[in-house]
Every structure is written in structure tokens, then in C-alpha cells.
Amino acid sequence: MHLIDYLLLLLVGLLALSHGQLHVEHDGESCSNSSHQQILETGEGSPSLKIAPANADFAFRFYYLIASETPGKNIFFSPLSISAAYAMLSLGACSHSRSQILEGLGFNLTELSESDVHRGFQHLLHTLNLPGHGLETRVGSALFLSHNLKFLAKFLNDTMAVYEAKLFHTNFYDTVGTIQLINDHVKKETRGKIVDLVSELKKDVLMVLVNYIYFKALWEKPFISSRTTPKDFYVDENTTVRVPMMLQDQEHHWYLHDRYLPCSVLRMDYKGDATVFFILPNQGKMREIEEVLTPEMLMRWNNLLRKRNFYKKLELHLPKFSISGSYVLDQILPRLGFTDLFSKWADLSGITKQQKLEASKSFHKATLDVDEAGTEAAAATSFAIKFFSAQTNRHILRFNRPFLVVIFSTSTQSVLFLGKVVDPTKP
């Protein structure tokens, strides 16, 4: 299973292509006196676990907002990519803008310090980028900076040290060259899965921040391609589509039918440190399940599915498909607490003192492919549950109607991708 996800954040004037020298402003004062580099290199335990609850809360708040506005549509995004990008941006935000970003991401700054937040992301990104058997996860960021603007050394140093961001200085007036530079970098880092991410840029942009996630994982129990056949998928009461349906009927899996909620939950493992939860609402109950989809509910299901009595032999039917999601974040995030960031009231003076910056446009794109071997990009899958007669007592799971999917990093307790598959034939 492979996952790829990209986020492009454009701040007013943030980009250009040239081979000139990058001007770093050493004399300017940052709005924060704390040294994230020194703080983050110390610490004990697993700092990423401290930020996991807030990251999960943001994931489900973002999902609920999208789902409420686009009923009947596929959804797919990487909350981790969005959170990491904006947490990095907060290094250059000051006063109310900095607190709005961090609190908008779900962090309670009276319980968790800013240094704890950045330490958590540093540990999280480092852990996810470690090589693993059968699992490849790559998370990265890049800053494309105008060579005509002087950037504060502390902001650049912290983004490189904490978020391992790569810096590119460019001539922003060379629009064609700048777009080519960004797209070539994204294409390379995403193994060719995302091409032509940027099609146009305004010349008042001074910086572009790009964050991406590439996730490629193999099923712990793969499907056999010769057993994949066309089957019906019931989008709604009036729409049925044909999809290539994979089959697995000799394996045991972790699944349950929730006795308190109208849904079934399946957990499937990938090789390495990742797992996926497929949540199948009963017919007509999708909205009811979406309303109770919280970090606490996900942990409840996860804890239940550790019990041996939920490990059962299944006849499993899962569609082979590709979906994607694209979101204009500057229209979404203000409703999640980022009230001033995309306005003239934004304070990004921790990036440069030379001139005032505003966040102009922010985009997020995620793609997912699911096949017999695993998944590429971000993943979502749907299934229905059905039982044979009492005489056979055999369990069948059919992913043949809309469902929810959560891809999860076990060691960091992080939601990597979250989505809903309504129509697996729609990209």
C-alpha cells in the first residue's frame, strides 16, 4: 500500500528561481527568544506521543468540516502533512498569529509548551523517515525563497534543524522557472506520483512552503491478483458502479460489529509500523458514524481489536481503486481557528523584518492507490458486512458500499491519512 500526500502553502511573495545568493538577516530580532534547535535536541521518551492527541483531534475536526460541506463525495487528505506544515510556519509567526496557528492545530498551550510541540514534530518526522522492512514513509518540507528578500536566520535555521526543511532561493519574477523548480522537486520527492502541482503563481509571492508525505506499504496478508473480478459497488440507493473486487478467503483478520453503534470495523496491518482501520456504517448510517468519529472512538476500537475473540477467519472482498483529494486550505482553516492568518492582520514578522507578509493561498493534495500488494498514496476503502447462515457460521466482509478509512502509525500513534470512499470509480 502506498500513500502520497502533498501540501502547498503560498505566502504572499514566497518563491523564485535563480542562482543568486540567499540574503539572511542576522541582525533582526525574532519574535521568540527560545532556541528550538537546542531544546529539541534534548528530551527523553517519545516526544511525538505528547502531540498525538492534538494531531488526532485536528484530523477529525478537519474531516467533519469537509464531510458536512461535501456530502456524497470522496474525501482523502493527510492531517499530518497539514499540521506539520503549519507548525513549521508558526516558527515565523508572532503574537496572536502564532497562538492562532498552534491552537487551531488543536494544541492547548497552557498544557503543552511551544517547545514541546516542535520537539514532538521533530521526533515524529524523524521516526516516520526511518527505514523499515516492507514500509517506506517519507515526510519532508521545502521552502522556496525570493532572493530579493532578507529572511531571519533564526527562522531558516529552525525550519532546517527541527523540520529538516530544504531551502531553495529563486528569482520570483521568473515565473516559468520558479514553477518548474517547485514541480520538479515535488515530482522527485513523491516518486513521480504528483506532477504539475503548481500551474500558476502571482508575482507578489515571496515564499512558497511545500510539505509532502510519501507512504508505500505492503499488506501483511496480500491478495492474489488472479482472484480479482468485477463486482457491484453500491454508491447510494440509485447508483451502482462496477469495480475490480479483490478477494481473500483463507486468512484471519481483526474485526468487530459495534454493539453500540451502527457500524463494523476492520483492522488490517501492513508490513512494518502501520495499520489501517476500515469503518463500515450500516446502510444509511454514514452521517451518524461521522458525528461520533473522534480520537477517543478510534482508540476504543483499537483497544477492542486487541482482544483475541475479534480475530476471525473472513471472506474479505475489497475494491481495487484510486482516489484523490484537493483542498483550498485558506478557505477551510479560518473556520478551524486560523482567523487572521489569511488576512492583513497576520503577523509573520518572525520570517522577515524587511516587509510585511500575508498568507495568500494554501493548497493540499493527497492521492491513494489500493491494489493486491498494498496501497500507494493515501488510502481509503469501503466495505459491507454480511453473514452466512447459522449452519456455516462463516463471516463475509464486502467492501461494496461507502466506508471510512484511517491509516495509522503505530509507534507514533499518529493519523497519517483519513478519508471516505463513496465512489471508488471517481478519482
From Swiss-Prot:
UniProt modification remark: The N-terminus is blocked.
Tissue: Expressed by the liver and secreted in plasma.
PROSITE patterns to which the protein is assigned, alphabetical: SERPIN (PS00284)
GO cellular component, one term: extracellular exosome
Coiled-coil regions listed: none
One Gene Ontology term of the molecular function aspect: serine-type endopeptidase inhibitor activity
Keyword rRNA-binding: no
Record-annotated site: Reactive bond: F388, S389
Signal sequence, start to end: 1-20
Superkingdom assignment: Eukaryota
Annotated keywords: Glycoprotein, Protease inhibitor, Secreted, Serine protease inhibitor, Signal
One family name in Pfam for this protein: Serpin
Protein family (similarity comment): Belongs to the serpin family.
Full protein name: Kallistatin
Organism listed in the record: Homo sapiens (Human)
Gene this chain is encoded by: SERPINA4
